From Swiss-Prot:
Protein name (database record): C2H2-type transcription factor RPN4
Sequence ranges of Basic and acidic residues compositional bias: 331-344
Entry annotated with the keyword Zinc: yes
Presence of the UniProt keyword Acetylation in the record: no
Organism: Candida glabrata (strain ATCC 2001 / BCRC 20586 / JCM 3761 / NBRC 0622 / NRRL Y-65 / CBS 138)
Length: 499
């Protein structure tokens, strides 16, 4: 009996169950029609009986029986003409249970034997064109590819050829050959830097901070004052000793030459462009031999103080500065003569291509004068570290490069001065805090105790790093784990000794 006969209402669960079991069977109705027409009528009837069995409701005899029982019921109710057929009687028994478990018969079909003939492609395309089928339907990749016959006929070699297409790369490179991001960024950076430099000179320079009356002056006068201030700042920074160098005042007729023609930004790149009005201009035919005659001979100076004063005034690291007049006041103990001025000046003519000016540099001392000055300027260093003991150490200096710090504490064992020398104060302090401490910790080596007994127990180490060096040097045959055990024993059995 069916649900219609019983008059019962079907629930949503029943509807979903029917759809799940009968979905594939409905889709394969067209394929079933293409089967061999010589199929036995008994097998066809069994399939129809299985399809109709899931549409019945609340019939325990139908839902609980197995496939074999269902086959027996079908055979008993078959028409007489089918039973009389000798071919049907000799046919093998149908595998009803196996047919029920085969939900998707297309899984057993290989991809090579499957073609577009199993599916009505024209009907599916018609549904897609009319919008009756959703494009995002639950199609398998195999089913979706079988719809497009052209895609199924493609070979894998064609896809590899598309990936390795050199013509496409050449077309792309030719199309975007002029697209150079790095060059554009560099041009933008240069333009921005130039604009920033111009704004800095025009707005933030000290020229704009002058009074209103000074704004009426010419550009040359304002640049002259601006560079004059810069030169005075350089003099104040480059002087090594203000007491030895007199304050230099530039004359009022200080002028600039060809500033705007050589440098439009208004900044001086070469200090040799500054020319004093009262001094003679330096020409290209000036020679170093003629001007070096006026230099004082450093080897003839008998006093080392005079040599040192001259060397202090010379800035040997700055070769691009202009000529700096230097004056030093020297007095003698046995004579009260007026102050004598010693001027050291040296000019060197350097001719540049396309320029008519030369650069002047400062005089450099000889190697002998440098040695005398360096030996005089060095002063002995005295270092007195703070310690808790009264007598700590002495500082001995054998030569200019080696310094030794000697410990003068009394050794509690020998009752004599320790006399240990160290090259660093850190080592001396660590030595005094460990060896000469009133209460210090000691470490023992377990391997020495095991091998030597009491003698090994008397062997102690003031620091743990000393014990580590002892293990590496004396117990080389120990493994890494055994060395760690020795160190662990020393840490857990620390001894203390009072002086």
């Amino acid at each position: 009996m069916t649900s219609i006969d019983l008059g019962l209402k079907r629930t949503l669960t029943d509807v979903l169950e029917d759809e799940l079991y009968n979905m594939r069977l409905r889709e394969q109705e067209t394929a079933q029609e293409q089967l061999d027409l010589r199929e036995a009528g008994k097998v066809r009837q069994v399939q129809l009986q299985q399809q109709q069995m899931f549409s019945q409701y609340a019939d325990p005899s139908v839902t609980m029986m197995s496939g074999d029982v269902a086959c027996e019921g079908v055979l008993s109710t078959a028409p007489a003409n089918l039973l009389a057929n000798p071919d049907i009687r000799q046919a093998p028994a149908p595998q009803a249970q196996a047919q029920m478990l085969q939900v998707n018969p297309e899984v057993l079909i290989s991809y090579a034997n499957k073609n577009s003939a199993h599916m009505n492609v024209s009907a599916v395309d018609d549904k897609l064109n009319r919008g009756l089928v959703d494009e995002n339907s639950y199609y398998d990749d195999v089913d979706y590819s079988s719809m497009n016959a052209k895609m199924a006929d493609w070979q894998l070699d064609d896809n590899v050829a598309m990936l390795d297409n050199n013509d496409a790369r050449l077309i792309f490179d030719n199309e975007f050959a002029d697209d150079d991001d790095l060059s554009d960024d560099e041009n933008l950076f240069d333009e921005g830097l130039e604009n920033y430099h111009n704004e800095l000179v025009s707005s933030n320079s000290p020229i704009e901070s002058l009074d209103v009356a000074e704004h009426k002056e010419s550009v040359d006068d304002r640049l002259r004052k601006y560079h004059l201030d810069n030169i005075q700042n350089i003099l104040s920074k480059t002087s090594t000793n203000d007491k030895d160098i007199l304050q230099i005042k530039l004359p009022s007729d200080f002028t600039t030459t060809n500033l705007h023609s050589t440098n439009p930004s208004g900044l001086i790149e070469d200090p040799s462009q500054l020319v004093l009005g009262s001094s003679k201009k330096i020409t290209e035919d000036t020679h170093v031999e003629e001007e070096s005659k006026n230099l004082p001979d450093l080897t003839e100076l008998t006093s080392a103080t005079e040599i040192e004063d001259i060397l202090l005034a010379v800035d040997s690291d700055d070769d691009d500065l202009y000529t700096k007049p230097i004056a030093k006041q020297t007095t003698k103990k046995d004579n009260s003569k007026p102050v004598e001025k010693t001027v050291v000046e040296k000019t060197s003519s350097v001719t540049k291509a396309g320029s008519n000016h030369s650069r002047s540099t400062l005089a450099r001392p000889t190697a002998h004068a440098r040695k005398l000055s360096s030996s005089r300027k060095q002063a002995p260093k005295v270092y007195n570290p703070k310690t808790t003991t009264k007598s700590t150490h002495t500082h001995s200096k054998n030569n200019a490069t080696h310094e030794a710090f000697v410990c003068e504490l009394v050794n509690s064992v020998t009752n004599e001065v320790c006399g240990a020398q160290f090259s660093r104060t850190y080592d001396l302090t660590r030595h005094q805090n460990t060896i000469h401490a009133k209460k210090r910790s000691i470490f023992r080596c377990s391997e020495c105790i095991r091998a030597l007994g009491d003698e090994g127990f008397q062997k102690t180490f003031s620091r743990l790093d000393a014990l580590t060096r002892h293990i590496k040097a004396k117990h080389e045959n120990l493994s890494l784990e055994e060395r760690q055990q020795v160190t662990k024993y020393a840490k857990s059995n620390i001894g203390f000794v009072t002086a």
